[in-house]
Amino acid sequence: METTLDKSPVGREATIKTISTEPTGVRLLELGMTPGMEVKVLFKAPGGCPLAIEVGEHYVLGLRLEEAAFVTVYSTKH
């Protein structure tokens, strides 16, 4: 199932398919998020923002919903 990272449920593992080439997407690439990388939404604050995203096995990144919408992912486990 393909979706954007902002719509991915908490706890679901996913793989990054694409990242937008808009300035926000480029910033995410600079932070180390790349296509093919495993990610997981660890936490969504009340109201959905911010999100805590586990990126690979290396770090956790805090993102706004608007930023997470630039990342397209597909589920790797159901």
For each of these PLM feature ranges, what is it?
Residues 1-78:
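Compact, glycine-rich, soluble single-domain proteins
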